[in-house]
Swiss-Prot record:
Involved in the aerobic and anaerobic degradation of long-chain fatty acids via beta-oxidation cycle. Catalyzes the formation of 3-oxoacyl-CoA from enoyl-CoA via L-3-hydroxyacyl-CoA. It can also use D-3-hydroxyacyl-CoA and cis-3-enoyl-CoA as substrate. This is Fatty acid oxidation complex subunit alpha. NAD(+) binds at M325, D344, V401, V402, E403, K408, S430, N454. PANTHER family: TRIFUNCTIONAL ENZYME SUBUNIT ALPHA (PTHR43612), TRIFUNCTIONAL ENZYME SUBUNIT ALPHA, MITOCHONDRIAL (PTHR43612:SF3). It catalyses: a (3S)-3-hydroxyacyl-CoA + NAD(+) = a 3-oxoacyl-CoA + NADH + H(+); a (3S)-3-hydroxyacyl-CoA = a (2E)-enoyl-CoA + H2O; a 4-saturated-(3S)-3-hydroxyacyl-CoA = a (3E)-enoyl-CoA + H2O; (3S)-3-hydroxybutanoyl-CoA = (3R)-3-hydroxybutanoyl-CoA. The gene is fadB. The active site is at H451. Residues 312-715 are annotated as: 3-hydroxyacyl-CoA dehydrogenase. One of its GO terms (biological process) is fatty acid beta-oxidation.
Amino acid sequence: MIYQGKAITVKPLEGGIVELNFDLKGESVNKFNRLTLSELRAAVDAIKADAAVKGVIVTSGKDVFIVGADITEFVDNFQLPDEELMAGNLEANKIFSDFEDLDVPTVAAINGIALGGGLEMCLAADFRVMSATAKVGLPEVKLGIYPGFGGTVRLPRLIGCDNAVEWIASGKENKAEDALKVGAVDAVVAPEQLQAAALDLAKRAVAGELDHKARRQPKLEKLKLNAIEQMMAFETAKGFVAGQAGPNYPAPVEAIKSIQKAANFGRDKALEVEAAGFVKLAKTSVAQSLIGLFLNDQELKKKAKKYDEVAKDVKLAAVLGAGIMGGGIAYQSALKGTPILMKDIREEGIQMGLNEAAKLLGKRVEKGRLTPAKMAEALNGIRPTMSYGDFGNVDIVVEAVVENPKVKQAVLAEVEGAVKEDAIIASNTSTISISLLAQALKRPENFCGMHFFNPVHMMPLVEVIRGEKTGETAIATTVAYAKKMGKSPIVVNDCPGFLVNRVLFPYFGGFAKLLGFGVDFVRIDKVMEKFGWPMGPAYLSDVVGIDTGHHGRDVMAEGFPDRMAVEGKTAVDVMYEANRLGQKNGKGFYAYETDKRGKPKKVTDPQAYEVLKPIVVEQREVTDEDIVNFMMIPLCLETVRCLEDGIVETAAEADMGLIYGIGFPPFRGGALRYIDSIGVAEFVALADKYAELGALYHPTAKLREMAKNGQKFFG
């Protein structure tokens, strides 16, 4: 053994070739943490010092190669002073460069996935062999940063600027055949042949059949583009990528700038350019928010995994109420391998549900994400029915009938009599109390909420709602089923609106106040979209449905009268009375026309302004900053209350619920991280400036205490 550590070993194979193997003890995947980097330093030094070594193959002892850097270390590292962070980055890069500069040929054998630092390790090798089932990529832009272990330097010199920009700016994972096509790898082989192929390549290089130094040289030199070619390549790319990424996500454009700035330098000077840009991005609030979001997501997955021990296996599911929502649930279940009964009392409802599922599956086939055979298999997994005849074998039933407590209670009581005693029954209600609905059931311990968001196939969140009498098995089984469907479940305790809608309606309350002061809803939408929301509140109201919003507002007002009750008519009332229900009937805040692709396109409608005139109580001048504060303060304060009331257990769950459920701007990290970014004391002072607007703008006593003590929600 040439070197043995806790993450890396180097052992001799044959003919002077050694294997540098990554296998981080106690972890399911390999990652570049402090330990792995320090051991890589020691391993490279050991190889360099051993005159008997003639070649190196780099392998993984895990099912994946290396998933990248240890993101949990970013939080502390990125707090370091700029000079210290840059020095640490350059020190790490020196390890990769020293590996690249070894006198002997090096071959990386890529299995599973090689992402971020994992791919950058491979780029430092002379040759790369890839398993046919493996994927490679540089996803750092999704964390608000860019590759920091030489990715912006080596990749463009290896596969050309255009390809490198596409890989780095998109952050996508690339299949083996695509990597081979652009020259990122030298060979693709069957998984079982990977080790042998890498060894064979190393032997050929040792024998002089392949010139490893010639292969290495372009990575050490400046980019092979003249000044005009550089200008054409980089300026075009920056314009296109900036348009794709938008102004709130600077990393993709910064990556291109870094490649451009380093184009005329050799490797070592180019790495300094990369490090300077990396440090600049690491210090942005966007990077802090997106890294926080990633860590929150990991926390969510860990919490959901804990339920696996108690959960019952769901072999057969059922959905009550077909239509668009029921069809979406049936599609998602069948697509992910759980057959499902889809029941409705109307033939046309069943047809609508089947059409929805077939349409969604068809789109996946069109995009090449599903084979026709798999589509047929999924469709066969949806069994339409108008009776409870086959419900005796069902493990979980999702009720998705009309949002009316009496109707739901009747249907729930009916289905309870048709299923086996230990079957779980879940209601896809968006606002109705689970404890109230449970009153109709004989086995309330087997009942919980399972709130999907529309459209089901696109929205990742599922709220799993615990009622007063809900048992742990019901929660665990529903969480496990949601995960099996490819969703991100969050367990919340029962209250009007649960987490997401409870937080969303105060946001709409701020919107109502702005409209009452005569502020143009088109302007409000533009300001909130600029803030980072996928759509403004007027457009969102139209998409959700004015009638749905009207009903939800009434439920919330009844549940929280101290701050959500309304005096007099609001915009949603007059729109509802004028039968302007939004996209569903072609008119709401906006009017809707059908575009060339058959999709609704919003246009301004003078009639909407006429309808809104009676609700304007006074004309008030407001700035764009006021608009953001009117909207965001109530949303953030209600999120704080949900955490304080124990509706959610953790700040991470609260923030992820908003990002996954209503499209809260990811680069802002969630409502609680947004408060942290402003500063808790500063946020409380800001809210107090708007105190005259009512209780929605009044911070809680506990938040004031946090402000006084200099506390934060994260870190």
